[in-house]
Amino acid sequence: MNFETIIGLEVHVELKTNSKIFSPSTNEFGSDPNTNVNPIDLGYPGTLPVLNEEAVNFAMKAAMALNCEIATDTKFDRKNYFYPDNPKAYQISQFDQPIGENGWIEIEVNGEKKKIGITRLHLEEDAGKLTHGEDGYSYVDFNRQGTPLIEIVSEPDMRSPEEAYAYLEKLKNIIQYTGVSDVKMQEGSLRCDANISLRPIGQEEFGTKAELKNLNSFSYVQKGLEFEEKRQEKELLSGGEILQETRRYDEKTKETILMRVKEGSDDYRYFPEPDLVPLYIDEEWKERVRSEIPELPDARLERYINELGLSEYDANVLTASKQMSDFFEEATAEGADMKQVSNWLMGEVSAYMNKHYKELDELAITPEALAKMINLIEDGTISSKIAKKVFAELVENGGDPQKIVEEKGLVQISDPAQLKQIVNEVLDQNEQSIIDFKNGKNKAKGFLVGQIMKATKGQANPPLVNKILAEELNNR
């Protein structure tokens, strides 16, 4: 029997508002434990939540970017559960009237495009962070308590772990472009739970799903789903039953492990939040937020191809990261050739980032500096080979490319008379290579070019070297 895989994802995104969703506490990552905490966050008696308008605007902006319908009437609800990182014993969330519904995004896998539906996008508050120490104690940091979150729930439209990976990449990219979140998984500002079930091919009814947690990277999402796909298939083929349960992905064993039997929404005893009035979002408010949405990745991709004339490959690579795309825009605005900027970003810059595990905004090089360096290549001041030395300095320490070239004596030798003298000195020292070249051995010319570059420490103008060398060889 063959099975069809059904996957849906629930993605939590922390919004980078200045303050928390219901209190004036600072919303900042990386502070000392329990320093960004307020009595409202902890649910002290007598405290009342006040809704952060910026969080609502950010949620609407994200929902609009994901093609959602924006609610006119919405409200907040209490989700009741007890856990040490939840001091109020309830979470303020949205149950039956989310801020956004019926959205979609388009993904591409193996050259095939596909729309993935988004069921809903709702606002809620985050819980604290629980850390289990090796000393047998558990420690809780309430800095994250009350951080504004949006939860984005997809339709069960994905049919493979590869599609789930592509969906996450596209979703992250869109949210990043809106500017409402940093969407950094390593900092917890993007978290993902996955639901997966199998059904016999041709059957319309869904199978029993399992929920996967502890998915700390996009690759773990894919690996966890791949394992769970095989586990469920094996269980079904042996006549077993799939239970509705929550499982976690173990990075060491590369397996999913049972955590608990899955709760249903009834277990949370949702009811309307009594301390917050319902929210009315009129058309004027919606249009004001819509006007603030910047150019999104698909629109930028189309512009790069149709207006700038970039290849589809280059445009896809550049727009896959807002940081990379913004860097490209700023560098070309400084007058650098766009193809050269694209080549450097996809080549040397990306290679450095991958080698050192750094983001683009962590590098010392600026768009202005890269543009100046490219212009130095274009006007013949430095060669492409010398440029790599300049780049190495810029990416580590920053600075002005012109000054680096002057201080390190890296200016390209382009004086014909000076180069002619060096070429003849090299020829005088390598008479056998001249004979070999005259006898049709073209490798001899390559050897001579190498000797000239060595004599000039790589600073000779390559096209000019080739021209003068050809002339002098003919004269011998």
Swiss-Prot record:
S-S bonds: none
Reactions catalysed: L-glutamyl-tRNA(Gln) + L-glutamine + ATP + H2O = L-glutaminyl-tRNA(Gln) + L-glutamate + ADP + phosphate + H(+); L-aspartyl-tRNA(Asn) + L-glutamine + ATP + H2O = L-asparaginyl-tRNA(Asn) + L-glutamate + ADP + phosphate + 2 H(+)
InterPro entries xrefs: Asn/Gln-tRNA_amidoTrfase_suB/E (IPR017959), Asn/Gln-tRNA_Trfase_suB/E_cat (IPR006075), Asn/Gln_amidotransferase (IPR018027), Asn/Gln_tRNA_amidoTrase-B-like (IPR003789), GatB (IPR004413), GatB_C_1 (IPR042114), GatB_Yqey_C_2 (IPR023168), Gln-tRNA_amidoTrfase_suB_CS (IPR017958)
Keyword Nucleotide-binding carried by entry: yes
Source organism superkingdom: Bacteria
Enzyme class label: ligase
PROSITE patterns from the UniProt entry: GATB
SUPFAM superfamilies in UniProt: GatB/YqeY motif, Glutamine synthetase/guanido kinase
Sorted UniProt keywords: ATP-binding, Ligase, Nucleotide-binding, Protein biosynthesis
Subunit: Heterotrimer of A, B and C subunits.
Entry's family note: Belongs to the GatB/GatE family. GatB subfamily.
Functional summary from the UniProt entry: Allows the formation of correctly charged Asn-tRNA(Asn) or Gln-tRNA(Gln) through the transamidation of misacylated Asp-tRNA(Asn) or Glu-tRNA(Gln) in organisms which lack either or both of asparaginyl-tRNA or glutaminyl-tRNA synthetases. The reaction takes place in the presence of glutamine and ATP through an activated phospho-Asp-tRNA(Asn) or phospho-Glu-tRNA(Gln).
PANTHER family from the UniProt entry: GLUTAMYL-TRNA GLN AMIDOTRANSFERASE SUBUNIT B MITOCHONDRIAL AND PROKARYOTIC PET112-RELATED, GLUTAMYL-TRNA(GLN) AMIDOTRANSFERASE SUBUNIT B, MITOCHONDRIAL
NCBIfam families according to UniProt: gatB, PRK05477.1-1, PRK05477.1-2, PRK05477.1-4
Protein name: Aspartyl/glutamyl-tRNA(Asn/Gln) amidotransferase subunit B
Biological source species: Oceanobacillus iheyensis (strain DSM 14371 / CIP 107618 / JCM 11309 / KCTC 3954 / HTE831)
Gene name per UniProt: gatB
